[in-house]
From Swiss-Prot:
<feature type="binding site">
    <location>
        <position position="187"/>
    </location>
    <ligand>
        <name>FAD</name>
    </ligand>
</feature>
<feature type="binding site">
    <location>
        <begin position="110"/>
        <end position="114"/>
    </location>
    <ligand>
        <name>FAD</name>
    </ligand>
</feature>
<comment type="subunit">
    <text>Heterooctamer of NDHM, NDHL, NDHS and NDHF. Dimer of heterotetramers.</text>
</comment>
<comment type="pathway">
    <text>Cofactor degradation; nicotinate degradation; 6-hydroxynicotinate from nicotinate: step 1/1.</text>
</comment>
<dbReference type="GO" id="GO:1901848">
    <property type="term" value="P:nicotinate catabolic process"/>
</dbReference>
<dbReference type="Pfam" id="PF03450">
    <property type="entry name" value="CO_deh_flav_C"/>
</dbReference>
<feature type="binding site">
    <location>
        <position position="169"/>
    </location>
    <ligand>
        <name>FAD</name>
    </ligand>
</feature>
<keyword id="KW-0285">Flavoprotein</keyword>
<feature type="binding site">
    <location>
        <position position="160"/>
    </location>
    <ligand>
        <name>FAD</name>
    </ligand>
</feature>
<dbReference type="InterPro" id="IPR051312">
    <property type="entry name" value="Diverse_Substr_Oxidored"/>
</dbReference>
<dbReference type="InterPro" id="IPR016169">
    <property type="entry name" value="FAD-bd_PCMH_sub2"/>
</dbReference>
<feature type="binding site">
    <location>
        <position position="123"/>
    </location>
    <ligand>
        <name>FAD</name>
    </ligand>
</feature>
<feature type="domain" description="FAD-binding PCMH-type">
    <location>
        <begin position="1"/>
        <end position="179"/>
    </location>
</feature>
<keyword id="KW-0521">NADP</keyword>
<dbReference type="Pfam" id="PF00941">
    <property type="entry name" value="FAD_binding_5"/>
</dbReference>
<dbReference type="InterPro" id="IPR036318">
    <property type="entry name" value="FAD-bd_PCMH-like_sf"/>
</dbReference>
<dbReference type="InterPro" id="IPR005107">
    <property type="entry name" value="CO_DH_flav_C"/>
</dbReference>
Length: 296
């Protein structure tokens, strides 16, 4: 391991100042360290400057407001998993948070780190994309908000997302669900814990008083560089009564979309079939919630 300069700012303003000061290096940010420490030990990352932001307690919160939920970037997966409102009302996020790594990893890993790392297999990435999340990025230059999907499409200093070298993700915002909405997440993996997703499927819907779908979001993680958008399947659901029959009618579209996206990969033969099984489980969960079933 090479030597590097290490800083542990106590305030967000101090952290932004350090990021600006060393932006040309550029610095590596560490929070939980569940990704960066491994990358440094394996010599994938060789930073000259490391900024530890774990002391920034001002970024560690979950705030439920009238129409939105605000999650500080330093909120751990354990904190998200154990939050009463998220557990009972935001099932996609609860399920994703509860299946990240192991209890030890969930105690350290943060939602901001998960999204900023932008791993293909990130459970938080799949869930938050499904929920149409917005992220907040801050620097001494100012603050900007963008949809998570736009964040992933950006080309920042690491070319993996829109984050610039002097920026820090401070918050994630999602819509607060109501009685006419539901979300679900299912992680297909080789083991029940300490496993990387094979497919991380996410689904969210809104319906009217008659049970007709007014909005749908369907995403498949670990299929492409970022969660695959099943846009054609969503369009089939919107305007139709949300029943098992109408949802299962989208399965051939899911199959074909995965094949078209990943046909050059050896895993496509497995994933184009298994994605249908993943979403069948999501359909059951969605209907259970809309019909007043158990949210646990």
């Amino acid at each position: 391991m090479k030597d590097f300069e290490f800083f542990a700012p106590k305030t967000l303003e101090e952290a932004k100042g350090l990021l600006h000061q060393y932006k040309d290096v550029p610095p590596a940010i560490i929070a939980g360290g569940t990704d960066l420490v491994i990358e440094i030990n394996d010599r994938w990352e060789k930073p000259d400057v490391v900024i530890d932001i774990k002391k920034l307690k001002e970024l560690e919160y979950i705030r439920v407001e009238e129409n939105t939920i605000h999650i500080g970037a330093l909120s751990t997966f354990t904190q998200i998993e154990n939050h009463p409102f998220i557990r009972s009302h935001v099932r996609a996020l609860y399920k994703a948070a509860s299946q990240v790594g192991s209890p030890q990893i969930r105690n350290l890993g943060t939602i901001g780190g998960n999204l900023s790392t932008s791993s293909v297999a990130g459970d938080g990435v799949s869930a938050m994309t499904t929920l149409d999340a917005t992220v907040v990025l801050e620097s001494v230059r100012g603050t900007r908000q963008m949809k998570l999907t736009d964040f992933f499409d950006g080309e920042g200093f690491k070319r993996r997302n829109a984050l610039e070298a002097d920026e820090i993700m401070t918050e994630v915002i999602i819509d607060r669900p109501d009685a006419h909405s539901a979300s679900a997440f299912y992680k297909l993996a080789k083991r029940k814990s300490l496993a990387i997703s094979v497919i991380g499927g996410g689904m969210a819907v809104k319906v009217d008083d008659a049970g007709v779908c007014t909005w749908a979001s369907m995403r498949g993680g670990c299929i492409g560089r970022y969660p695959l958008h099943f846009k054609q399947a969503e369009e089939m659901l919107v305007g139709a009564p949300l029943t098992m029959e109408t949802m299962e009618a989208t399965l051939p579209i899911l199959h074909d979309t995965v094949y078209d996206m990943a046909r050059a990969r050896p895993s496509v033969l497995y994933k184009k079939e298994s994605v249908q099984g993943v979403f069948k489980k999501l359909f059951v969960d969605i209907l259970d919630q809309l019909e007043g079933g158990c949210n646990e």
